[in-house]
Every structure is written in C-alpha cells, then in structure tokens.
Swiss-Prot record:
One Pfam family linked to the record: BMT5-like
Signal peptide range in chain numbering: none
InterPro entries: BMT5-like, SAM-dependent_MTases_sf
Entry-linked PANTHER family: 25S RRNA (URIDINE-N(3))-METHYLTRANSFERASE BMT5-LIKE DOMAIN-CONTAINING PROTEIN (PTHR11538:SF101), PHENYLALANYL-TRNA SYNTHETASE (PTHR11538)
Name of the molecule in the record: Uncharacterized protein At4g26485
Recorded superkingdom: Eukaryota
MF GO annotations: rRNA (uridine-N3-)-methyltransferase activity
GO BP term, pick one: rRNA base methylation
Organism: Arabidopsis thaliana
Length: 209
C-alpha cells in the first residue's frame, strides 16, 4: 500500500532531510511525529552521545524514539567538515537544516561584541560551504535565525551570497508551528538544558545559484 505524503511547514515526508546542530533532538522528533516516520531523516549533533545525556534531560529519550521511527542518528558531526564525513558524504539531501546556529557559550551575554559576531558568521559560513556540496540539484539549505539586533548583524543573506547561494525565500518562523520543539541553550555549562525564547526570527531558504 502506498504511503501518503505528509507535510509540516516546509518539510515533506518524501524529502531526504539532514538536520545539523541538534541539541535535545526535539526538532527532529517533531518532524518524525508529523510524518509518522523518520526513514528519510538524518539527525546530527556536534556533541557525543554521552555529552548529550549530561546536557539535556530528554535527549536520550528523544533519540530512542527517533530510532524507533527509523531515524539515522549521527553524533560528533562538525558542520565545518561534514561534507567529508564518511557517514554523510555519499548522500545528497533535499533539505539541510540548521536551526539557531551559535558559536558557543563563551559568547553568551556578549553578543554585541565584534568577536562574537565574527565567530558566529564563521560558523554559518562553514556550514553553508559544506552544505552546498551535499544538496540534491533542486535542494534547499535552511537556516532559522533571530532577526533582531545584534543577530541581524550576522548578515545571513550576505553569507549565503558569498557561498554562491541564492536566497529563495525568507519565511517568518513560529515556534507554535512545530509542536514539541523546545529550543535549548546547549552552552555546555549548568544552563545547557535551559529554554531560550526565540523572539522575532525567520527561516532563510537558500538554493544553488
């Protein structure tokens, strides 16, 4: 029996989806729950599995549910080098998604500094450089990011253009559109599991030029 296609916002159950920088894996689980399957989802974290279990109370439970849905879970995936990762490099994806990229806890409370902004931009630039090598011909790279100052100074659209990508669309992001998705600080300290408010933010959708 043919399984019907299911959608949640910009994502279809038929898309081959790569999620990077997952914290507690709640966004991955949101998509899997909406689709009723995660057979087409690869969800990755920079952290090791042990680090995740320390940082987030619900990460291990979320990962176990995702595995039952058929999700491919990968740990210690660096967005700066992921296009060379043996477990990912042979794949091509319809959607590559990085939600709320951040260069790390050393910049919490210092987002106004030029050093922080440049470090964040370098993270996004490295992600885009690798992600564009992993796209299907008509695939899209999605970055969800705060649009208020100082986050607006990252210049997401300009960073995409610098990597030879075209901004297809900029769509307002509403957390309520993704049931079960809980944004976490993920700083590596005692506040890793704390929720952070998303405020005004958008999803930037890039394609190959």
């Amino acid at each position: 029996m043919e399984i019907s296609e299911k959608w949640i916002r910009h994502y279809s159950s038929t898309h081959k989806i790569l999620l990077v920088g997952e914290g507690n894996f709640s966004f991955s689980l949101c998509l899997a729950s909406a689709f009723g399957s995660a057979m087409n989802i690869t969800a990755t974290s920079l952290d090791s599995e042990d680090e995740l279990s320390i940082k987030y109370m619900d990460a291990v439970d979320n990962i176990n549910i995702l595995k039952r849905y058929g999700c491919d879970i990968q740990h210690e995936v660096d967005v700066h080098t992921m296009s060379f990762d043996n477990s990912l490099s042979l794949q091509r994806y319809d959607r590559i998604v990085f939600n709320f990229p951040h260069a790390g806890s050393r910049f919490f409370g210092r987002e106004l500094s030029s050093r922080a902004i440049e470090s964040h931009k370098e993270l996004v630039r490295g992600f885009l450089e690798n992600a564009k090598e992993m796209l299907e011909e008509d695939g899209e790279i999605h970055i969800t990011h705060k649009t208020t100052y100082p986050f607006s100074d990252w210049g997401i659209k300009k960073l995409g253009k610098g990597e030879g990508l075209k901004l297809l669309k900029k769509s307002k992001f509403e957390l309520s559109h993704y049931p079960g998705y809980i944004t976490k600080r993920g700083s590596g300290g005692r506040r890793s599991d704390d929720y952070f408010p998303v405020g005004e933010c958008s999803t930037y959708m890039f394609t190959q030029s």
